[in-house]
């Protein structure tokens, strides 16, 4: 199995090769030779960027693991090298509401600090509900929760232009909605953080 760093390097190399090939094809006069050269350069840049990105994300992951220890928040690294925070409903929002609970604020405070230290990342916040209520109500509520989370981060210095939000309602359960405990699992907020590959490629190329 690949380590997180090796996975990041491999992912970055693949993206870099694709970008390099595209750049060579669009901007060059040398046909296939130019494309191959662009792909080779892109692969080198992509490999460096993937390693660099993985290292930065690993640091942020460690910070958030320490900040959320014992809270029920799950901090993981996704297969595509994004940082994922899964926040359960018992610490984030009361039933049927989009107001951030006090326990969630302290987590978001630390999270905002890690985001301002790494300004090249982008953030996706997705709200989820259980199957109680109508689709229209759940879609609206899940979006409002994502929006509340974004606004809280923005008030603590995170540029809102970096943050995308969505409400998926009850459509992506992680447990069968057959018990109160399982419904509570489905009421959650997921936050994904990703390093911008384009920005990192530009940083490496500038060196």
Feature-to-residue mapping (PLM):
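Short, low-complexity, glycine-enriched hydrophobic/amphipathic alpha-helices that associate
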Residues: 1-61
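Extracytoplasmic/secreted proteins, especially bacterial periplasmic and envelope-associated proteins
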Residues: 9, 14-21, 35, 59, ...
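Second-shell loop/turn segments in exported
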Residues: 49-53, 92-100, 135-138
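Amphipathic, membrane-active segments
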Residues: 57-84
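Solvent-exposed coil/turn segments that connect beta secondary-structure elements
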Residues: 69, 78-80, 88-90, 96-98, ...
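Periplasmic peptidoglycan-binding/anchoring modules of Gram-negative envelope and division proteins
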Residues: 72, 93-127, 154, 191, ...
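Soluble periplasmic/extracytoplasmic beta-strand elements of cell-envelope proteins
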Residues: 74-76, 82-88, 92, 122-126, ...
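Periplasmic OmpA-like peptidoglycan-binding domain that tethers envelope proteins to the cell wall
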Residues: 128-202
């Amino acid at each position: 199995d690949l380590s997180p760093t090796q996975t990041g390097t491999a992912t970055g190399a693949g993206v870099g090769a694709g970008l390099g090939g595209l750049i060579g094809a669009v901007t060059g006069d040398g046909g296939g030779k130019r494309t191959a050269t662009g792909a080779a350069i892109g692969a080198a840049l992509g490999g460096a960027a993937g390693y660099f990105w993985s290292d930065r994300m690993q640091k942020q992951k460690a910070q958030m693991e320490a900040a959320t220890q014992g809270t029920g928040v799950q901090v993981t690294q996704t297969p595509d090298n994004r940082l994922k925070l899964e926040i359960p409903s018992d610490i984030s929002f009361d039933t049927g509401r989009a107001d951030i609970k006090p326990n969630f604020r302290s987590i978001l405070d630390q999270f905002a600090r890690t985001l301002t230290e790494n300004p090249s990342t982008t953030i996706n916040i997705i709200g989820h509900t259980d199957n109680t209520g109508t689709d229209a109500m759940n879609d609206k509520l899940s979006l409002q929760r994502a929006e509340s989370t974004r606004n809280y981060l923005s008030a603590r210095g995170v540029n809102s232009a970096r943050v995308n939000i969505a409400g998926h309602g009850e459509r992506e359960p992680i447990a069968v909605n057959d018990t109160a405990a399982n419904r509570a699992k489905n009421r959650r907020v997921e936050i994904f953080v990703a390093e911008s590959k384009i920005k990192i490629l530009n940083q490496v190329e500038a060196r």
